[in-house]
A protein has these predicted regions:
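Beta1/beta-strand and adjacent pyrophosphate-binding region of the FAD-binding site
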Residues: 1-12, 28
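Short hydrophobic core segments
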Residues: 5-7, 179, 186-198
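Conserved Rossmann-like nucleotide-cofactor binding loop
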Residues: 12, 35, 198
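Active-site substrate-recognition segment that forms the wall
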Residues: 18-19, 47, 79-81, 186, ...
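Glycine-rich FAD pyrophosphate-binding loop
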Residues: 22-41
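Helical element adjacent to the flavin cofactor pocket in flavoenzyme catalytic cores
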Residues: 134-189
């Protein structure tokens, strides 16, 4: 009998498991894959601590970035945390002031740069491909290092990790009593589901409806390269957020339980990040498909990513790399 069971070993699940174990609870973390396959496996690793727009989210941003700055020392393993520039590119035909107004409520206000100023800050940018950019201070971690560091620290404190699939939650009467897995039952009165995009199907199998959704995210990873990208680059007008907002209508919620639907056409948010070991990840193409196991034409996807990225980062769009994909969860409340 454990005090807590955490389902899902991505950045959310492993962070929570570590903090609970550190607080003195007995914790079992259950993760399906020894090599992560969800959003934590393909994220850029950016920390948008500037983005808080309410008193609560601003407090979370303030406390969160302070925590990130000290974690490597506490864990004894480098998460590769660093402070970098974030450049949110503005399309050539967009109104910079209108784009800027979308960020007026942020905890830290951006600096509006014209195209030449943005290219001075990030020489890899194509001045003819942008109308300017918004500059933010930004945090960045290597998600693989972050998860690995927490995993080792969690286990040193006595936490347990089991790699198996959770089939459903165990409910007796009106009480949650544990989980049923491919390795049998594990008991606890406190279960936290941190399974990302797979949370919806897990909760449904347990008789619980939830408004959790997902996109199919696709990006390209390179090997370490000599080319240098100083900043994290992303679009100021992110199409993925528009996709998410357009697919969470409560009247259409049931369609997410029927595989085979494409709710909106795919879109690309052109951006890139270079990691400390000089690998570059660029993308991101997003699809809204109701089947988490849908087959995707990787050749077509890679071509679409390269076409859009090459418009703003031409040298990066031409780099050799490996196409990858994962599911990225989102909720109905913009969180």
């Amino acid at each position: 009998m454990y005090d807590w069971i955490v389902v899902g070993g991505g950045i959310t699940g492993i962070s929570l498991s570590y903090e609970l174990q550190k607080a003195g609870f007995s914790v079992l973390l259950i993760e399906q894959h020894q090599q992560l396959q969800g959003g934590s496996s393909l994220g850029y690793g950016g920390i948008s601590y500037w983005a808080g727009s309410t008193s609560v989210t601003q407090q979370l941003c303030y406390e969160g970035i302070a925590r990130q700055r000290e974690l490597s020392n506490e864990l004894g393993i480098d998460t590769e945390f660093r402070e970098i520039d974030l450049l949110l590119t503005i399309e050539p035909d967009a109104d910079p002031q209108e784009i800027l107004s979308q960020y007026v409520s942020c905890w830290i206000a951006p600096t509006l740069l014209n195209a030449q100023e943005a290219c001075d800050r990030e020489p890899q940018l194509n001045p003819k491909g942008i109308g300017g950019a918004l500059l933010f201070p930004h945090g960045h971690i290597n998600l693989d290092s972050f998860v690995s560091a927490h995993s080792q620290a969690f286990q040193k404190l006595g936490g347990e990790i089991i790699y198996t699939k959770v089939d459903r939650l165990l409910i007796e009467g009106d009480r949650l009593v544990g989980v049923l897995t491919e390795q049998g039952e594990f008991r606890s009165n406190q279960v936290v589901v941190c399974a990302g995009a797979m949370s919806r199907s897990l909760l449904k199998a347990s008789g619980i409806r939830s408004r959790i959704y997902y996109t199919h995210a696709e990006a390209i990873d390179t090997e370490p390269v000599d080319l240098e990208l100083r900043s994290m680059v992303m679009p100021a007008d992110t199409k993925r957020y528009q996709l998410e907002g357009a697919t969470t209508n409560i009247d259409q919620d049931s369609i997410w339980d029927i595989a085979g639907h494409e709710l909106l056409p795919p879109s690309v948010d052109a951006g890139a990040i270079q990691f400390c070991d000089r690998r570059i990840r660029f993308g991101q193409l997003s699809r809204v498909l109701t089947d988490p196991y849908a087959a995707i034409d990787r050749i077509q996807s890679e071509a679409a990513i390269r076409e859009q990225v090459s418009k703003i980062l031409p040298k990066i769009g031409a780099l050799n790399g490996k196409w990858r994909n994962c599911l990225v969860a989102f909720s109905s409340d913009n969180l």
